[in-house]
């Protein structure tokens, strides 16, 4: 089995020598992210990816998930790896501090995410979709929605996914037929069919928040 080794030397060179990450983070209001802190994060990230995720890559591919009685079971070791991912603070890296996150710039998290994609892409798909759902809620959600969902999603207690694909359309959102009809109480009635949702079901988190992308019906 090929062992994964995080390219820490290359990452340090890009961050420190090419991008001047210390000045970059300071401009973003995070002058606490010194070169020493960045290196420490990279080193701990490498340990997690090399020691926890990479060993599950081949076994996860060979075993795959199982679907029985409406329940999805991830490959052996995935649920425990996800628990460690959350407990070690990796899930909350870029989450807003107001909702329990660490408030790291995405540029700080990017090297760790690259490690994950190299060590175990299947595992990264689950966490990456949560990142997307958190970003969408943070940008467009009401204060009530943010307060309800973001703390648990940022901590990793809940995961998220994005429901785009329909039976007749993949990533071409112009072809969507799922509809969202405004209701008198301010909510929307959604009708339509979504399929092939990456990360749409798993046994690693307590809850899964599924964001659906519909076509909004205009009120005449």
Predicted regions and their residues:
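Short, conserved phosphate-binding/catalytic loop or strand-edge motifs used
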Residues: 109-110, 128-134
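Internal maturation/activation junctions in enzymes
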Residues: 126-130, 141-183
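Flexible loop/turn segments at secondary-structure boundaries
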Residues: 99-103, 132-136, 144-145, 168-172, ...
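Amphipathic, small/basic residue-rich leader segments at the start of a protein or domain
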Residues: 1-124, 148
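Short glycine/proline-enriched turns and hinge-like loops at secondary-structure junctions
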Residues: 104-106, 172-174, 201-207
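A short core secondary-structure module
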Residues: 187, 191-220
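Structural beta-strand/beta-sheet cores of well-ordered domains, especially the beta-sheet scaffolds
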Residues: 11, 123, 133, 156-160, ...
């Amino acid at each position: 089995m090929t062992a994964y080794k995080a390219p820490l030397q290359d990452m340090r060179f890009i961050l420190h020598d090419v991008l001047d990450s210390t000045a970059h983070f300071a401009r973003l209001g995070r002058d606490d992210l010194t070169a020493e802190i960045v290196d420490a994060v990279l080193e701990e990230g490498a340990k997690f990816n090399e020691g926890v995720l990479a060993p599950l890559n081949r076994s996860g591919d060979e075993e795959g998930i199982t679907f029985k009685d409406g329940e999805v079971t991830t490959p052996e070791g995935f649920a425990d790896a996800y628990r460690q991912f959350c407990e070690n603070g990796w899930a909350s890296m870029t989450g807003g501090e107001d909702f329990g996150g660490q408030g790291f710039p995405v540029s700080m998290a990017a090297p760790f995410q690259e490690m994950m994609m190299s060590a175990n892409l299947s595992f990264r798909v689950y966490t990456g979709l949560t990142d997307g759902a958190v970003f969408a809620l943070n940008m467009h959600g009401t204060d009530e929605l943010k307060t309800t969902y973001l703390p648990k999603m940022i901590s990793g207690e809940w995961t998220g996914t994005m429901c785009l694909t329909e039976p007749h359309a993949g990533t071409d959102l112009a072809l969507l037929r799922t509809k969202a009809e405004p209701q008198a109480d301010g909510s929307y009635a959604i009708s339509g069919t979504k399929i092939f949702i990456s990360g749409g079901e798993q046994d690693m988190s307590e809850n899964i928040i599924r964001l659906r992308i519909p076509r909004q019906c205009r009120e005449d």
